[in-house]
């Protein structure tokens, strides 16, 4: 059988692409080296932030707004346990923060619902938070967090119900191109398609070693917290920048545990076995202490944690482009630790590519050619 589309990597983007392409009537094969959702990539750990007024650059705002619409649609499949939780997101940092300036600019350009608070205003609204006098907060009322593993599980199930073929626990070992399309090699045999999407995450260079993607080991952890830090008490998700420039992110507490991670830093790795479990690097358990001690002093001890990986591009912007010399193969990689919130729209972009539809978005900033 020759498929319309083969998807290599069925984590966040691949799961979405499988669903949207199958829903569009295409004959699709989803593949993954493991059984998604799983612990081997960048999507585990239950939750991911979604921010609309994007501090990483205005070019992302149209994408994230479309992503939000798609997340809202997907959430309707799980109304008892919603995939998207509109908790709000407070972005904290020094008044002269470049990141916060970008958040403010994105909000102004796109007329987003963002409220600016000074230090006293932040601490009055959320007494659990402490910030210096020179800090400001930009509160995104309409943002919140996503249940990442539930989202992937839902997409995979919906795709399967719609007739999508799924080949999991079966790594793709090679990709070949010829006049007939794309052929993938796996332990289960060879499969052909007219087009392919490569969204293999951290270890995409095992297939395409020429790509400028660097895996980085990252950790996040859950700390003891009480009901004051919960969504029920209107405690928001957050990003926070310390005076030294370190960037943190976190979520409202659930079951008396608050999850937090550090966005910058981490350990550069070159193979999967270098991504050692949480606590095997001496700094893992204390990485969030500078933020917790200064900004959330009421949070207790570290309960448990996990390791994941970022697939970093050189400039930490996404790579969304066809494989050089092969216009029938789309790459979506280099998501650099801020990609999950876009998984829905990136999956839709992939499905449009498979149908020969022109994207509604300007993807020029994400081309591979910027690194040449």
Curated annotation (Swiss-Prot):
* Residues carrying S-8alpha-FAD cysteine: 308
Q: InterPro entries attached here?
A: FAD-dep_OxRdtase, FAD/NAD-bd_sf, Me_Trp_Oxase_MTOX, MTOX
* SUPFAM superfamilies given in the database record: FAD-linked reductases, C-terminal domain, FAD/NAD(P)-binding domain
Which enzyme class? oxidoreductase
* Entry's EC annotation: 1.5.3.-
Keyword Ribosomal protein included in the entry's annotation: no
pH curve summary: Optimum pH is 8.0.
The record lists the catalysed reaction(s) as: N(alpha)-methyl-L-tryptophan + O2 + H2O = L-tryptophan + formaldehyde + H2O2
For activity, the cofactor(s) needed are: FAD
Give the UniProt entry's GO cellular component terms.
cytosol
* Activity regulation, free text: Aromatic carboxylates are competitive inhibitors.
User: What's the record's note on cofactor binding?
Assistant: Binds 1 FAD per subunit.
**Binding residues annotated for FAD, in chain numbering:** 4-34
Name the protein family: Belongs to the MSOX/MTOX family. MTOX subfamily.
Q: What is the annotated quaternary arrangement, including any partners?
A: Monomer.
The record's function comment reads: Catalyzes the oxidative demethylation of N-methyl-L-tryptophan. Can also use other N-methyl amino acids, including sarcosine, which, however, is a poor substrate.
Instruction: Please give the name of this protein.
Output: N-methyl-L-tryptophan oxidase
Task: Tell me what organism the protein belongs to.
Answer: Escherichia coli (strain K12)
């Amino acid at each position: 059988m020759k498929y319309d589309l083969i998807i290599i990597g069925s984590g966040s983007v691949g799961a979405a692409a499988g669903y949207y392409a199958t829903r569009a009537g295409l004959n699709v094969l989803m593949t993954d080296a493991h059984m998604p959702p799983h612990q081997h990539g960048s999507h585990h750990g239950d939750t991911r932030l979604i921010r609309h007024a994007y501090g990483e650059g205005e070019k992302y705002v149209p994408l994230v707004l479309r992503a939000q619409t798609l997340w809202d649609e997907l959430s309707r499949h799980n109304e008892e346990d919603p995939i998207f939780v509109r908790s709000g997101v407070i972005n904290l940092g020094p008044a002269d923060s470049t990141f916060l300036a970008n958040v403010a600019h994105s909000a102004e350009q796109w007329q987003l619902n963002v409220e600016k608070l000074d230090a006293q205003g932040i601490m009055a609204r959320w007494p659990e938070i402490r910030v210096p006098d020179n800090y400001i907060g930009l509160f995104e009322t309409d943002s919140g967090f996503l249940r990442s593993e539930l989202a992937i599980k839902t997409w995979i199930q919906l795709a399967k119900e719609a007739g999508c073929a799924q080949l999991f626990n079966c790594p793709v070992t090679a990709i070949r191109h010829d006049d007939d399309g794309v052929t993938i090699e796996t332990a289960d045999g060879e499969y052909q398609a007219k087009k392919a999407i490569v969204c293999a995450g951290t270890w995409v260079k095992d297939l395409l070693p020429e790509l400028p993607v660097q895996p980085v080991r990252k950790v996040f952890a859950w700390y003891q917290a009480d009901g004051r830090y919960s969504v029920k008490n209107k405690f928001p998700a957050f990003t926070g920048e310390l005076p030294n420039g370190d960037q943190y992110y976190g979520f409202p507490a659930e079951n008396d545990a608050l999850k937090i991670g550090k966005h910058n830093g981490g350990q550069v790795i070159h193979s999967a076995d270098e991504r050692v479990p949480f606590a095997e690097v001496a700094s893992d358990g204390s990485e969030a202490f500078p933020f917790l001690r200064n900004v959330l002093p009421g949070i207790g001890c570290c309960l448990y944690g996990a390791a994941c990986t970022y697939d970093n591009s050189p400039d930490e912007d996404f790579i969304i482009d066809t494989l050089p010399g092969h216009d029938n193969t789309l790459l979506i990689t280099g998501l650099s630790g801020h990609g999950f919130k876009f998984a829905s729209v990136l999956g839709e972009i992939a499905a449009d590519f498979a149908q020969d539809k022109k994207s509604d978005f300007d993807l020029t900033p994400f081309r591979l050619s910027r690194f040449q």
